């Protein structure tokens, strides 16, 4: 099972600060490390994790077919691009229903990993309020198969805008 740690990017800044505090800043190499560290801290974070989210969703779909689960979930089928963060948060909440209904250890691990990946990607997006978006409970209830198909569509919206 792969577990990605998207929070490791911030540790490089801590390393640079440690170098600075240990008086390495006075050497030419220390100055180069400090300047490169400042530049790398300002670079945008790559969002390659969305493809892993899609892969995890496909794995969940295959596992659910094997255990014959037939729950209905609140599903955003035609999300407006301005509401994609709200839609993603609803999808992540509904994943908890799959987790509860399946009681499968493999599905549990995949959903935990998927949630971590999606939340790390969402954390890099500005926290802006999306007006006019539907609440999760206002969405239509659909089958798990339809839910996962719509979930992949929302993830692709994030991939296309990054």
UniProtKB/Swiss-Prot annotation:
Gene Ontology BP, a term: natural killer cell proliferation
Disulfide bond entries: 83-133, 90-136
Gene3D superfamilies listed in its UniProt record: Interleukin-15/Interleukin-21
Protein name stated in the entry: Interleukin-15
Main function: Cytokine that plays a major role in the development of inflammatory and protective immune responses to microbial invaders and parasites by modulating immune cells of both the innate and adaptive immune systems. Stimulates the proliferation of natural killer cells, T-cells and B-cells and promotes the secretion of several cytokines. In monocytes, induces the production of IL8 and monocyte chemotactic protein 1/CCL2, two chemokines that attract neutrophils and monocytes respectively to sites of infection.
Signal peptide span: 1-29
Family: Belongs to the IL-15/IL-21 family.
Location in or out of the cell: Secreted
